[in-house]
Amino acid sequence: QAEDGIRDRSPSRGLGDVYKRQVQGMQDWNVDPHQVFGGPVGVNWYQEYIDSGYDVRGILGQWGHHYPDQVSSHDGIGSGNGLEARQNMTRWDWAQDLFEWFEYYLKGVGPKPDLTAQIQRSDGEWRIEETWPPRDVVWNDISLGNCTNQGNSWVGGAPVVGGVSEVIVECPAFDQDVHIAGLVRLHMLASAVYDGGQVFVEMQDSVTGVRIGHATMDIRYHSGGNEPTGVIPGQTVTMMMEFQGIDHLLPAGNGIKLVMTTSGKDYLAPACGAACPVHVHIIEDSILSLPLIDRDGSNVLITPQRE
């Protein structure tokens, strides 16, 4: 659930009293994280407001389309969609936080709130960052050519015997803990047989199978943005995919698995149906880029939970 305190929605405004308070479910399927951390190519809306002179504060938890203290809804979440963070998810203090925010910005009462981002990792740990995604991420590129493709390289089309047409790619395990924090990129070469086609990618822990995040793209929008670039049947293009915001700790010894289908979650299948499969190229030039951070625990936030 997203909550705003804002007097001007244009991030280009640089003068006057402007502020934004964001309460966001990192597993929200309605107001999804990309509406907060996405934007046009090269833009992260959350950071764009900060850079434009807004006072911005965020509480970013692993709940779905719920309020931070909506316990009954939190109890119904599934694995890979917030369950692993459930024991430390509920924020009983969020309404008090909101009250103090508006007391200061609407009435001038009380101290100025800290302009930070409180982010919950997928295993439940809360911490305080200056912004999110953090500014100090280090990008780690993984060539899909170094990963294992389990046979198929077509997304969509007529179902194969025994199930739907999907592509499964498993990448090597990491030799140390890996903390993903931000918008994972997948720049993948692909070819269409039709003026259309769609790829939905679910990222999983290769050992446990737990969902980490997802991305989806219509190949006609392969360059990103809101307007279709279009595609010529048989043409190879680079699908510049970006995952919904992820804050996840992948333990040493585990790797990443990518499962590619035509649709997933609540996204609609392509209108062209089985007539528009997409050939994905699991090769060296297709790159998965992970934004990684290293934290020592000094910015961990302890939150009260029910007994």
Please place each PLM-identified region on the residue numbering:
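Short beta-strand/loop motif that positions the catalytic acidic residue
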Residues: Q22-Q24
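Catalytic histidine neighborhood in serine/cysteine hydrolases
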Residues: Y49-Y67
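Catalytic histidine-centered segment of alpha/beta-hydrolase-like enzymes
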Residues: H65-Q87
